[in-house]
């Protein structure tokens, strides 16, 4: 029975890397991409559809680079690829993490809510890293009126103290896509162009962080808010990152084999048959032109885990091959295309 306890649990809907590791959940190792990303420009944009494991991936980045995790490296990464190949940047940054799916509301409220969300995150940032700043400085940031003021204070002070900062933005286009869908072009244009508040904060991000990693689901907003950001920073279609998110066929094979060997799925299961059955449904994704010929396509993470859980419970494929949770996203995407 002890053996049974040690079998890794199937994660589903978990977007926090640290939880996945600490709760002994199955993790598809993506850490070999860390040195590849470090070789790219300092500011990176990465676009993928929903449910490809974006949030787990960026929480892995966060955990890896956060100075507060410097001493937890073995505990978090010891069993992963990077555990044997750490880069010199591990644990070197103060990380500001923003998730813009937390911002919503109609256009009248949007700017206020956006500012409030950023204020809360910036206050939390100086609180979490208060050991690196003076008490007076922390007080000054907490008292500053709006997000841009807080941001400028933090950036200036960090430069003065030689602290390296890393900005991670998840769902950067979440509320702008909602605006586009629900309130139309004009409203969208107002916030993403010229003096629009959203465009404005992007200008402030640039040049003020040592590294930036921004991710979302569509390139639409990207072009609108990031003119002046260099094109080389857009790595979504670079072949070497084609399989950075999602599961490769090999990942899926390894996962199902692991659960079969641990007696969690039927001993007579034919894994190649399972993969072939899933393929037409789950792996029509390819993000780099040159990868179409040379590389395997990638499977949607949530769908594979949905299939696996179903297979463990019933011994067969789910009756509904598409996880009902993903349907709503496809309808949203259709509007954007």
Describe the role of every protein-language-model region.
Residues 61-63, 113-115, 181-189, 219, ...:
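Short secondary-structure boundary/capping segments
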Residues 101, 170-171, 205-230:
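A short beta-strand-to-loop transition that corresponds to the Sensor-1 phosphate-sensing loop
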């Amino acid at each position: 029975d002890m053996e049974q306890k040690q079998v890794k649990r199937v994660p589903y809907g978990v977007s926090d890397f640290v939880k996945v590791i600490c709760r002994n959940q199955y993790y598809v190792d993506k850490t070999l991409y860390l040195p590849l990303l470090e070789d790219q420009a300092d500011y990176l944009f990465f676009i993928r559809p929903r449910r490809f494991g974006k949030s787990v991936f960026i929480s892995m980045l966060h955990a890896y680079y956060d100075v507060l995790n410097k001493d937890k490296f073995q505990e978090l990464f010891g069993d992963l690829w990077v555990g044997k190949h750490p880069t010199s940047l591990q644990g070197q940054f103060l990380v500001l993490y923003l998730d813009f799916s937390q911002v919503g509301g109609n256009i009248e409220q949007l700017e206020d809510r956006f500012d409030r969300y950023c204020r809360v995150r910036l206050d939390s940032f100086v609180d979490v890293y208060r050991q690196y700043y003076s008490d007076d400085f922390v007080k000054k940031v907490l008292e500053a009126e709006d997000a841009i003021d807080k941001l400028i204070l933090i950036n200036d002070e960090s430069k003065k103290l030689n602290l390296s900062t890393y900005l991670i933005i998840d769902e950067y286009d979440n509320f702008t896509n909602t605006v586009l869908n629900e309130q139309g072009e004009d409203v969208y244009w107002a916030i993403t162009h010229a003096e629009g508040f959203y465009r404005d904060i992007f200008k402030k991000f640039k040049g003020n962080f040592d590294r930036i990693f921004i991710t979302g689901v569509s390139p639409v907003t990207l072009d609108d808010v990031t003119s002046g950001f260099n094109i080389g920073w857009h790595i979504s279609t670079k072949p070497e990152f084609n399989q950075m998110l999602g599961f490769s066929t090999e990942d899926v094979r390894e996962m199902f084999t692991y659960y079969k060997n641990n007696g969690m799925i039927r001993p007579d299961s034919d894994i190649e048959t399972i993969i072939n059955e899933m393929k037409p449904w789950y792996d029509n994704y390819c993000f780099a032109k040159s990868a179409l010929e040379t590389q395997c396509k990638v499977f949607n993470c949530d769908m594979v885990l949905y299939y696996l859980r179903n297979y463990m419970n019933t011994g067969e494929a789910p009756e509904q091959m598409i996880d009902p949770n993903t349907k709503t996203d496809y309808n949203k995407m259709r509007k954007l295309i």
